[in-house]
Swiss-Prot record:
Disulfide bonds: none annotated. Residues 80-175 form the Toprim domain. This is Recombination protein RecR. Keywords: DNA damage, DNA recombination, DNA repair, Metal-binding, Zinc, Zinc-finger. One of its GO terms (molecular function) is DNA binding. The lineage of its organism: Bacteria, Pseudomonadati, Pseudomonadota, Gammaproteobacteria, Oceanospirillales. It comes from Alcanivorax borkumensis (strain ATCC 700651 / DSM 11573 / NCIMB 13689 / SK2).
């Protein structure tokens, strides 16, 4: 079916989002044009505001509206404890848990030489500077368990060791509420390796 050029432009714009193919993009465009004109205007305004007003925190690389993000600005956060994560979504997951009171360093990806993502693209030079300032006493590695995530964790481990900073890795294994019969062997093996004493 042939669309008006502006409709095609809207559909193509939606396909830049992860997981949105041409059919989903078409449905979204039709929904906005058919019955969501005011919602579409609000979406456009929010997109413009975010594209113009959101930047990366100078300290941790998370999203921010000024030079520092709310976590780095908060004097109640423990600046000696820094959790290394791949994405701002990972920060949100930790924050929603309500258990972590340290700061973060957001890599915005993981090492992947085949994709042209090296240490500089992940801001690891910035992390190295922070480590050498002497204010960080422990890094918590919370990268993924993929090949890229493990390579990134090992690279960061080397930086931390060179700076004399302690390193820990988040536990991995069986999810809360998970049934063992549905857990894959590699995950179960990791859970066994990461076991700890059990007390009441």
């Amino acid at each position: 079916m042939k669309h008006a050029p502006l409709v095609d432009q809207l559909i193509n714009a939606f396909t830049c989002l992860p997981g949105v193919g041409p059919r989903s993009a078409q449905r979204m465009a039709y929904a906005l044009l058919d019955r969501g004109r005011e919602s579409g205007r609000r979406l456009g305004d929010a997109l413009h505001a975010a594209m113009d007003g959101v930047q990366h925190c100078e300290r941790c690389r998370n999203y921010a509206q000024s030079t520092l993000c709310p976590v780095c600005e908060d004097p109640r956060r423990d600046a000696s404890l820094v959790c290394i994560v791949a994405t701002p979504g990972d920060v949100l997951a930790f924050e929603q848990s309500g258990e972590y009171r340290g700061q973060y360093f957001v890599l915005m990806g993981e090492l992947s030489p085949l994709d042209g993502i090296g240490p500089r693209e992940l801001g690891l030079d910035v992390l190295e500077q922070r480590l050498n300032e002497g204010q960080i006493s422990e890094l918590i590695l919370a990268t993924g368990t993929t090949v890229e995530g493990e390579a990134t964790a090992h690279y960061v481990l080397g930086l931390a060791q060179d700076a004399g900073v302690g390193v820990s890795r988040i536990a991995q294994g069986v999810p809360m509420g998970g049934e063992l019969e549905f857990v894959d062997g590699a995950t179960l093996a990791q859970a066994l390796k990461g076991r700890r004493p059990f007390d009441a």
